[in-house]
């Protein structure tokens, strides 16, 4: 989106705070329905980030697939579960929770240090979209594939990783 600088900065801060508050809501709220709604807020904020970065197709796919389908499916599954099983044997902190928290925190710290230490300007992309001539013979689906493989490669990979994590989480919940 071509917005003036202060408006763009305000929207970035507003969406970033929405992401942080929604993420905290997903983790800290004890009612799983409220957590699912907080997850919907996070996914909508991510989609709005894509709109701010002129990735309209990725934003539409984010809204349709994640907010429209996966979040509704999570809400549907949570509403069918027995609500009383969430509050039985409620322990505030266990050794497994502490170990999991320690592992996740160490992964987060290592990712942050890796991202900050990487020289992003030194990365040379082998294929750029301005080198690919989009002819009239190329169909729309091929153009979308070209853009996903060049311009929107990182957002596409982030979405696939998020989908993989959601799938692993669904399998873990289903096994219990």
From Swiss-Prot:
Keywords: Chloroplast, Membrane, NAD, NADP, Plastid, Plastoquinone, Quinone, Thylakoid, Translocase, Transmembrane, Transmembrane helix, Transport. Its main location: plastid. It is an enzyme of class 7 (translocase). Pfam families: Oxidored_q3. The chain crosses the membrane at residues 10-30, 32-52, 61-81, 92-112, 152-172. One of its GO terms (molecular function) is NADH dehydrogenase (ubiquinone) activity. It comes from the Eukaryota. PANTHER family: NAD(P)H-QUINONE OXIDOREDUCTASE SUBUNIT 6, CHLOROPLASTIC (PTHR48479:SF1). This is NAD(P)H-quinone oxidoreductase subunit 6, chloroplastic. It comes from Gossypium hirsutum (Upland cotton). The gene is ndhG.
